[in-house]
C-alpha cells in the first residue's frame, strides 16, 4: 500500500535473515552462524574486527518493564535485533549504557518500533549515543528521533524543535493513542505518520514539504494546520484520510503530487496562486484555482494541471510556455507619471530560459500590489489609476516563483 512501508518491511526481513548467516553485515562487522541462549534472552555474537559483542535477538521472559542487560556471558550487549516484537508483554524498555549507534554496530533500533505493546523507552544516563524524554527515544544531541512507542498513552506530542531528522523505520507509524501532533520546524520534510490515530497535525512553514504517503490512512485526521513556507506536497500524502473535510493550502506552495487527496472527505479545494503543477487529482473535488493553471490529459486519461505563461506581441499570435521556464521578469519602464483620474496599463517583459522574448507577459500569472492605495489603485490585470497627487510604488510579482520588479508611479 505504501511504498516506503514496503521497503521498510523488506529491509527488516533482510536484516532478520542476516542474523542467522555467516555473511558479513558490512566489510567490518561479522555475524556468528547461530543464536545463543542466555537466561530469557537469545543473542548472536558479532565482531567489528577488534572486539566481540552481543546482539539480542529475542526475549522470552515475562517482565513487562524490561531492563536490557549491559552484558551477557561476558559480552557487552550493544544492539537489539528483530525478535523482541514477538513478546507482547513488554511495556517499558530501559536501554543500557552499552547500546551503541548503527554507525558502530550497523544495527539500528527499528525493533522498538515494532513492539505493539510498548508504552515507554528509557535510557541509562551514561549512554553516550541515546537519550529519552517523556518515553520517546532520541539521539544524545536530540537532533534525531528514533522511536515513539506504539502504545504510548499521551494524546499530544510536540516534537522538540531540535529534531532535524526522524529515522525512516516506522518511528511514527501506527501510533494507537496519539491525537495531536506538532512537528519540529527544523525537519526538511514530514516523516511517515501513516496508519496512526492522529486527529490534528501542525506543520510549521519552515518544513519544505509533505512527503509521499506521510499521513496515508490516518482515518481520524480532521485538522491540518500548515503555515506559510511549505513548497510541495508529494504523492498520496493524505490518501484515505476520510475524516479530513477541509484544508487550507498556504501561499508559496508550488506543487501537489498524484492522489494527494484521494478518498478524503474534501469536496472543495482552493489552490493558492503560487502552484505551478497539480498532478492527478480526485475528479470529485471542485477546484478553485488560478487561471494560469491549464488543464491537460495524459495518455491514460488522467487529468493534471500545469502553469502556463502566455506572451502576447502586437500583430503576432500569442505564444504559451511552461511557467517553470521563466527565468526573469522586468518592467517595460520602471517609472510612470500619470494624471489624477487617468489610467495606464503596466507591461511586463519576460525571459524564457534566460532569453528575452518579444512581446509582453499576460497578467494572469502576475500579482500587482501598491504601496499607497490612497494615491494609486492597481487592478488584477495591471491597470493603474491615479487617485490623488503623490507617489507610490507598484510591485509586480510572478505568482509561481515570487520573482518581482517594482515600478515607481507619480500622480500629478
Task: Give the label of every model feature segment.
Residues 250, 322-412:
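Extracytoplasmic soluble-region selector
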Residues 169-170, 211-214, 235-237, 257-260:
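Consensus positions within tandem repeat domains that build extended binding/scaffold surfaces
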Residues 39-45, 49, 129-130, 366-368, ...:
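Extracellular/luminal ectodomains and secreted, surface-exposed scaffolds of diverse proteins
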Amino acid at each position: 500500500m505504501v511504498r516506503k512501508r514496503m521497503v521498510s518491511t523488506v529491509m527488516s526481513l533482510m536484516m532478520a535473515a542476516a542474523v542467522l548467516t555467516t555473511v558479513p553485515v558490512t566489510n567490518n562487522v561479522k555475524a556468528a552462524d547461530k543464536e545463543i541462549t542466555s537466561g530469557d534472552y537469545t543473542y548472536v555474537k558479532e565482531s567489528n574486527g577488534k572486539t566481540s559483542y552481543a546482539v539480542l535477538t529475542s526475549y522470552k521472559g515475562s517482565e513487562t518493564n524490561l531492563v536490557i542487560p549491559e552484558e551477557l556471558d561476558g559480552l557487552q550487549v550493544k544492539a537489539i535485533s528483530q525478535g523482541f516484537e514477538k513478546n507482547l508483554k513488554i511495556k517499558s524498555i530501559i536501554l543500557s549504557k552499552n547500546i551503541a549507534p548503527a554507525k558502530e554496530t550497523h544495527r539500528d533500533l527499528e525493533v522498538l518500533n515494532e513492539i505493539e505493546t510498548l508504552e515507554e523507552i528509557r535510557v541509562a544516563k551514561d549512554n553516550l549515543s541515546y537519550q529519552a524524554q517523556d518515553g520517546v527515544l532520541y539521539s544524545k544531541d536530540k537532533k534525531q528521533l528514533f522511536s515513539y512507542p506504539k502504545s504510548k498513552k499521551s494524546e499530544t506530542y510536540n516534537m522538540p524543535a531540535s529534531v532535524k531528522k526522524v529515522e525512516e523505520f516506522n518511528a511514527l507509524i501506527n501510533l494507537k493513542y496519539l491525537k495531536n501532533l506538532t512537528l519540529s520546524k527544523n525537519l526538511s520534510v514530514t516523516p511517515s505518520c501513516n496508519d496512526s490515530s492522529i486527529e490534528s497535525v501542525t506543520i510549521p512553514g519552515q518544513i519544505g514539504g509533505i512527503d509521499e504517503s506521510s499521513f496515508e490512512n490516518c482515518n481520524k485526521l480532521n485538522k491540518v494546520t500548515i503555515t506559510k513556507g511549505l513548497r510541495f506536497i508529494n504523492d498520496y500524502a493524505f490518501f484515505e484520510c476520510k475524516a479530513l473535510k477541509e484544508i487550507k493550502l498556504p501561499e508559496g506552495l508550488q506543487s501537489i503530487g498524484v492522489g494527494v487527496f484521494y478518498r478524503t472527505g474534501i469536496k472543495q479545494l482552493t489552490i493558492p496562486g503560487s502552484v505551478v503543477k497539480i498532478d492527478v487529482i480526485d475528479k470529485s473535488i471542485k477546484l478553485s484555482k488560478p487561471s494560469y493553471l491549464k488543464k491537460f490529459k495524459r495518455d491514460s486519461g488522467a487529468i493534471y494541471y500545469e502553469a502556463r505563461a502566455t506572451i502576447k506581441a502586437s500583430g503576432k499570435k500569442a505564444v504559451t510556455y511552461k511557467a517553470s521556464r521563466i527565468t526573469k521578469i522586468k518592467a517595460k519602464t520602471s517609472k510612470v507619471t500619470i494624471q489624477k483620474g487617468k489610467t495606464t496599463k503596466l507591461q511586463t517583459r519576460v525571459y524564457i530560459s534566460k532569453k528575452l522574448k518579444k512581446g509582453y507577459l499576460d497578467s494572469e500569472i502576475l500579482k500587482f500590489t501598491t504601496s499607497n492605495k490612497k494615491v494609486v489603485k492597481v487592478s488584477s490585470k495591471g491597470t493603474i489609476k491615479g487617485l490623488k497627487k503623490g507617489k507610490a510604488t507598484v510591485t509586480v510579482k510572478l505568482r509561481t516563483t515570487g520573482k518581482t520588479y517594482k515600478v515607481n508611479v507619480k500622480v500629478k
